[in-house]
Every structure is written in C-alpha cells, then in structure tokens.
Swiss-Prot record:
Compartments, record wording: Cytoplasm
Name assigned to this protein: Proteasome subunit beta 2
Record-linked Pfam families: Proteasome
Known EC number: 3.4.25.1
Primary location class: cytoplasm
Record-annotated active site: 13
Known partners and oligomeric status: The 20S proteasome core is composed of 14 alpha and 14 beta subunits that assemble into four stacked heptameric rings, resulting in a barrel-shaped structure. The two inner rings, each composed of seven catalytic beta subunits, are sandwiched by two outer rings, each composed of seven alpha subunits. The catalytic chamber with the active sites is on the inside of the barrel. Has a gated structure, the ends of the cylinder being occluded by the N-termini of the alpha-subunits. Is capped at one or both ends by the proteasome regulatory ATPase, PAN.
Alphabetical GO biological process terms: proteasomal protein catabolic process
HAMAP family documented for this protein: Proteasome_B_A
Amino acid sequence: MSNNVEEKILHGTTTVGIKATDGVVLCADMRASAGYFIANNNTMKIQRIDDHAGLTLAGGVADAQNIVDVLRYHASLHRIRKQGPIPIKSLARLTSLIFHQNRGYPFMADILMGGFDAVGPALYNIDMFGSVEEKSYVTTGSGSPVAYGTLEEEYRADLTADEAKGVALRAVKAAITRNIGTGDGINVAVINGNGFELLTREQKKAVIAL
C-alpha cells in the first residue's frame, strides 16, 4: 500500500469492535477530518445494516456510504427471498467481494462488520483490498495504536456485552486523548439476540464519564 493511500485510510477516526459472549459491541468517535481541518463534529460512523447486523466506517465517507447502501439492499433482499436474516459471514464475504471487484480503483474504506445470527455473535474486519479476518476484538483508524493498548489490557474471552461496552468506550476515549484525528464524542451500538441498539447519551454516561 502506498503511503498516500495508507494515509487516506488511517488519517482520522477510531473505531472499535468487540465480540462478547452474548453479542457484539461497535464503537466509534464522531469527528470527520480533512487533513488538519475538522469537517464535521457529529459524524455517525456506526451504521445499521439490518436488525441483526451493523458496521463501523473508517476512510472515505462517500465510498463507505456506497458500501452501506449495497449491503442494506442485499440484506433486505435476503429477508424477502429466504424469509430470514442473512448470515453475518455472508455479509462479510459480500463486503469483501465489493472491495475486490473495485481493486483497480479501490474504495478508500476499512470496515468492521459485526452482528448476531443463528451461529451467535460474529465480528469481521474487511480492508480496502477485500481481505477478511474474523476477530475477537479489533480497532481501525489513526487512533487504533492507542485504542489497542486499552483493548489488549482489558479484553477477556468471557466478556459480556455489558462489560464490552465499557471496554470499547474506554478504548475510544483513550484515542481521543492522544490522537488529533479522533474526537467530538463517542457512539456505541450493541447487537445481540434482541437486535441492533444504538446507545443514548444517558446510557453511555451510565457506563463511563464522557
């Protein structure tokens, strides 16, 4: 990857994903930056794909939104044709295919895909070339080196979703402290057997001080 392309992917943003025993937690900051310019301080980097699936976005906003639209379409189509939710692994493979088909003029995005299906919780990282990795925990963006410090210290294989919310929030909060491309608040979503839930400010404040 050239330095210029890598900078486009890594500059700005911190997103975190954690697979818990009973669900998946997705977390991200709210700052959109262009170089040293803060373009937006209320950016939603967590997107619902279906009732049982969501993703986080890092990289180019337009490219990421295009991918979200395609995934939502196919998730809805699967529900109609198969009378049920699309497996998370299938969504991850579809995302990989979208990236791979455009490798000549790649989408500038890095995706964390999480959800809860018949198999249970699942978390994947899909990069701009279509590589797919299943993860227990992962972070992307320019603040990821800082966030990994918190994740590697606090992650346990037996974390519940309630516990994982705190770990994810603390990881992104640490990145906000040390990374200029990360900031302006934190969003967090939980995906489990009850569906996709984006936490309110009051719910987040009940977990950690923001």
